[in-house]
Amino acid sequence: GVAPDGGSISVNSYYMELNESPFIPIMGEIHYTRIPNEQWEEQILKVKSGGVNVICTYVFWNIHEETEGVFDWDGDKDLRKFISLCQKHNMKTLVRIGPFCHGEIRNGGIPDWLYGRPFLIRTNDREYLKYVDRLYAEIASQLEGFFYKDGGCIIGIQLENELQHSAAPWAIRYPDQPIDYTVADYDVQNTKFGVSVQEQDIQSPEAGNQHMKTLKEIALSHGMEVPLYTATGWGNAAIIPQEVIPVTAAYTYPTWADIGMSPFYLFRDIHTTPDYSPVRYEGYRYPSFCAEMGVGIQMTYGRRPRIPAEAGEGLMVRSLGSGANGIGYYMYHGGITPQGKRGFFSDEPSGVPKMSYDFQAPIGEFGHTRASYHSLRIIHHFVNDFGHLLAPMGVVLPEYSDTITPSNTHTLRYAVRKKENAGFVFIT
C-alpha cells in the first residue's frame, strides 16, 4: 500500500516493511465499545506510551445493530470518533470487521434477530450475504477517509474470526434443547471451544476459504482497501491463500483447556511450524504474525487463574526468539461489556461475567496499569529500536530443543535470531 505522502507498507514471506525498511508491528487490542468514550483519548495515549505501535479493535455487529435495520454509531459506539483519535495521535490501526468476532460477546457479535433465519450464517448463503453487505457498508462509512491510501491510520483489516475453527453459543435457544453454535450445519463437527489444536479434518474447507474470499470482495466493494488483510490461521481455520496474512495465537493460561504446563515457553521455529498446527497454509510463505498473545486471560465462573507479569514477559521473549515478526496482544487493555436493550452483551453461556472484561490485561478495565505493562514496555522499546535488524533474521535453535518438555525446568531454554555475522540471543 502507498500513502499520499509517498509512505509505503509491504509484506514479504518473512516480515513487514514500513517505508521500505523492515518493521515489526506491536499490536494492542482495545475495544472502544467497552470503554467510556470520554476516556478514549487518555487510554489511547496510555497504550502508545506502553510502546505499542498498532491499535486493534473489534467492530461488534450486534452492539451496533441490536434492532434489525437500526444502526447506532453514537456515544461509546462512535467508531469514527475512536479512529479519529488514533489518527490524531499517530497510532496505526487494524480494524477487525467481523461479521463474526467472538471477543466473549453475546453470539460472538452476531445479532439475536438472525437466530432461526432460514439460511446458513458464516457462509456464502445469498441471504446471509445481504446482511453482511449492509453491515460492511455501514462500517465503511464510519472509516471513510481514514484508510492508509487516504493518508489515514488504518493499515489493516481482519476478516471474520476463527472461521471453521471456533464459534460462540447462541445466547437464545428453545427450552430444554442443546446449545446451538454460531456456525453452518456442515461446520458443527469442526467447532472447537476456544483457541486450540484441530485434531480432525475440516468437512468443507473450500467453502470456508471461498467465504473468506467473498468477505474480502464485499469489503473492497465498499472502499475498505488497506495494505494488510489478516485472518485467524490457527487450528486449521479458513484463510484466503496468498491474499491474507494468517495470524497465530498463544494462550498460556487458557480457561477452556485442560490444566497443564504451557508449551508456549518452549522455543521453536514458528515461521515454518506455526503454533496450534496443523494449519491450512504453508508457514514459510507468510510472515509469522501473532495476533492473540494471551499475557492475561478472562476470568470465568469455572476457572479463575491469576497470571503473573513474568508469564507475559516470558511468552514475548519466547515468541520473538521463535521467529515472530509481529506481536499482537489480546487483550492489551481490558474493559466493561456494555448493556443493551435486552440485557448485557457478554457471552454468558460461555461462563464469562456480565460486565467485567478486565482480562488481566497490561491495562485493566478501569485504565489502571499492571506490572506486565511495565515489563513488556521494555521489550517493546527493544523491538521499536532494533526491529529493523531483528525482522530479517532467521531462527537458530540448540540441537536438543525438540527434547525439552514444558515440565523440564533444568535445561537452558534459548534461541538465536541471526543474519550473517550478527544476531540476538533470547533466553527464558
Positions of the model-derived regions?
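Alpha-helix N-cap and loop-to-helix initiation/capping positions
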Residues: 70-77, 127-131, 203-207, 306-311, ...
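Carbohydrate-binding surfaces of carbohydrate-active enzymes
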Residues: 129-136, 140, 150-155, 163-165, ...
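Short alpha-helical segments and helix-capping/turn motifs at coil-helix boundaries
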Residues: 40-42, 74-82, 139-145, 211-217, ...
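Conserved beta-strand positions in the central sheet of alpha/beta enzyme cores
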Residues: 56, 94, 158, 328-331
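Aromatic-lined substrate-binding rim segments of carbohydrate-active enzymes
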Residues: 40-113, 215-220
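Active-site region of glycoside hydrolase catalytic domains
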Residues: 88-94, 101-267, 276-296, 324, ...
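N-terminal carbohydrate-binding accessory modules
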Residues: 1-54, 84
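Acidic-and-aromatic substrate-binding clefts and catalytic sites of carbohydrate-active enzymes
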Residues: 32-38, 64-65, 69-74, 236-238, ...
